[in-house]
Curated annotation (Swiss-Prot):
Gene: YWHAE
Subcellular location(s) of the protein: Nucleus; Cytoplasm; Melanosome
Name listed for the protein in its UniProt record: 14-3-3 protein epsilon
Its job: Adapter protein implicated in the regulation of a large spectrum of both general and specialized signaling pathways. Binds to a large number of partners, usually by recognition of a phosphoserine or phosphothreonine motif. Binding generally results in the modulation of the activity of the binding partner. Positively regulates phosphorylated protein HSF1 nuclear export to the cytoplasm. Plays a positive role in the antiviral signaling pathway upstream of TBK1 via interaction with RIGI.
Residue positions, PTM N6-acetyllysine: K50, K69, K118, K123
Stored Gene3D superfamilies: 14-3-3 domain
One cellular component term from this protein's GO annotations in UniProt: melanosome
Keyword annotations of the record: Acetylation, Cytoplasm, Host-virus interaction, Isopeptide bond, Nucleus, Phosphoprotein, Ubl conjugation
Modified residues (Phosphoserine): S65, S210
Amino acid sequence: MDDREDLVYQAKLAEQAERYDEMVESMKKVAGMDVELTVEERNLLSVAYKNVIGARRASWRIISSIEQKEENKGGEDKLKMIREYRQMVETELKLICCDILDVLDKHLIPAANTGESKVFYYKMKGDYHRYLAEFATGNDRKEAAENSLVAYKAASDIAMTELPPTHPIRLGLALNFSVFYYEILNSPDRACRLAKAAFDDAIAELDTLSEESYKDSTLIMQLLRDNLTLWTSDMQGDGEEQNKEALQDVEDENQ
């Protein structure tokens, strides 16, 4: 059995070398020890999976965009190749999502003892079911969306009672949960309500903000406000379709 400290160091080396698949493997072994992860370990695990999934999500969006343009042109010969390529990326996305969801359900959530870590892991569970919902269709999409909603709600229930409104993990949860309402459930009204409530609650308690989380919290508050501005203009018909995909997951790396 690998030593925990060695595995963490291997993960840090892999991160520096930008070899995120190996970073995932090291942190999966730590998670498999069924112990409460430290904040540093938790963040290493999150960053590892986020980079592995992020590259594929970006690829999927580009391929889907090319597919759409080709559909408009009516280029059937190329469409078959594009669709097969997209499906290959979707298979990779599915494997990564199912992998981390399995680690969360079997190891991380059962071993979590603090409110903070429970919120972090349930939020993560919501995020990866959301990523599945992004490309799934029919019943698969419905199931992924329902699983995501349940996980985000579980995280929210704990966050509301155990974390202050200015806590970066609580704010990050509100950010991602509101994106879920907007993008997956097509409910801009609920997305705006959630984001606005989180922003207003944090503003009201800004004086309680600890020095170490000030930068993280204010950054996420800015993102909440940016999303609100974008969504409000979209609802009024002013905004053109914009891809703000990069906004919602920024908080994971710094907590």
